């Protein structure tokens, strides 16, 4: 079966778990996919306030005097800085899962209404946010798909900020191939799940 997803207004079904009405944004700089992914997550939780790409980027620790000096993008630990800087969020990340995660982990967070930010080798290094998962109604995982909010949505003739990826295929490419040192959270299966702290 092939699906045409209705994007923002999609609702969960027997096979599809989706964050309905997740709003997307397009990054305004080549380097800002990480902070734009964070912006979308903040918006999802109605916590955006006056934050923007520049103000969120300023919350990241400096990479000066490290092997990544001059790198404008966002490492895992810098993405964590963003949510710690905004405040009021609990964070689960690949730092908590040294053996990695798999499809059922992602489905679990989505079913709790939590978007999953990921950093992988798309475009040679890119942050996106998984907002949906479709089993396609089969027992096999090899036809499952992720729906992502993509701040660099330039390749499908519809720059609406949504994309679809074969889930298993993405998981086997879920790496930055050593681009980030362990001191910055490493390079493999980089993900971040932020959710509002219980009050």
Predicted regions and their residues:
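Active-site-adjacent substructure of cysteine-protease-like catalytic cores
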Residues: 95-151
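Noncatalytic regulatory segments and standalone regulatory/sensor domains
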Residues: 10, 133-199
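Peptidoglycan cell-wall recognition and remodeling modules
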Residues: 63-66, 123, 160
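Detector for Asparagine
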Residues: 9, 52, 77, 84, ...
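Cysteine-nucleophile protease catalytic domains, especially the papain-like/related folds used
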Residues: 11-97, 180-181, 185-189, 194-198
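Generic detector of well-ordered alpha-helical segments enriched in charged/polar residues
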Residues: 57-60, 80, 103-107, 171
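Short, small-residue-biased leader/transition segments that mark boundaries at the very start
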Residues: 1-5
């Amino acid at each position: 079966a092939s699906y045409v997803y209705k994007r923002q207004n999609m609702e969960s079904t027997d096979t599809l778990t989706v964050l309905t009405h997740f709003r997307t944004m397009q990054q305004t700089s080549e380097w800002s996919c990480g902070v734009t992914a964070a912006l979308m997550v903040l918006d999802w939780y109605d916590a955006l306030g006056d934050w923007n790409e520049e103000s969120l980027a300023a919350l990241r620790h400096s990479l000066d005097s490290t092997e990544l000096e001059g790198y404008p993008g966002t490492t895992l630990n810098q993405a964590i800085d963003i949510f710690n800087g905004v405040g009021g969020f609990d964070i689960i990340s690949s730092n908590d899962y040294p053996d990695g995660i798999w499809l059922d982990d992602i489905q679990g967070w989505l079913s709790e209404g939590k978007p999953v930010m990921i950093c992988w080798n798309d475009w040679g290094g890119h942050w996106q946010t998984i907002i949906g998962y479709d089993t396609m109604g089969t027992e096999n995982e090899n036809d499952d798909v992720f729906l992502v909010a993509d701040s660099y949505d330039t390749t499908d003739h519809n720059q609406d900020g949504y994309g679809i990826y074969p889930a298993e295929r993405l998981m086997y490419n879920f790496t930055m191939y050593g681009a980030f040192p362990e001191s910055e959270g490493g390079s493999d299966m980089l993900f971040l799940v932020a959710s509002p702290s219980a009050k």
